[in-house]
Amino acid sequence: MLSIKNLKASIEDGTQILKGINLEVKPGEVHAIMGPNGSGKSTLSKVIAGHPAYTVNEGSVTLDGKDLLSMEICDRANSGLFISTQYPTEIPGVNNVEFLQMALNSKRAYLGLEPLADADFKKLCEEKMAMLEMDDRYRDRGVNDGFSGGEKKRNEILQMAILDPKISFLDETDSGLDIDALRIVAHGINQIMSPEKAVILVTHYQRLLDYIKPTYVHVLRHGKIILSGGPELALKLEEQGYDWIEEN
């Protein structure tokens, strides 16, 4: 599914942030990426998404064999990539549900499918909103406009549920969530998952992984994945921090 090989990327002044990332994600897997602040976790998601502030210096990223790095940003999304950001953007004046319908039909057009009928989209949206315990107030508001931090995170998972991506890269989805909101968001992610899909979770905390069980846990430090393991690795990091890890 997603293959990242020797990915190196820098910012405008030439400072290299990613220094050789290697990661293989297969269908049905959940990968958790943990690491100290400034280790390159958010940069990795932005580079995969095609953020213009970053330059890829070396390496490759493919999704189902397709070269993501050569694609326009919209084509990456339409090909099955979903990125949830640490700080979701507010778009005042753009209706939340209309935005979702437009995004979904854009993806369907890219895949050669007819637009989803209004009645069918309404039903789909209502089902996914109910799954995330979102009330009708979300329907008529601007995209993330005036939303609390927790509401923005929940709205991102609604977008993920509607767009039905092959692989989702969720950057600190648990940030700013209380226990109840965390439970709801995690339930939504688990409901969306299937044997054909995959998720990459960036998190600092074990508490998210109590709800969403990772297949693998990776430690990212100084722009490299320096250690990988199973769910037990996250528990050890929770107990001991990162200082015990030696770079190989």
Where are these regions (language model features)?
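Q-loop/switch helix immediately C-terminal to the Walker
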Residues: 83-87, 93-109, 121-124
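Conserved beta-strand-loop-alpha-helix hinge in the C-terminal portion
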Residues: 211, 220, 224-247
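The feature captures the beta-strand-to-loop junction immediately N-terminal to the Walker
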Residues: 34-36
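ABC ATPase NBD Q-loop/coupling interface
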Residues: 60-76, 144
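Walker B catalytic motif
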Residues: 169-173, 180
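Conserved structural motif at the start of ABC-family nucleotide-binding domains
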Residues: 2-4, 17-20
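ABC ATPase C-loop
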Residues: 160-161
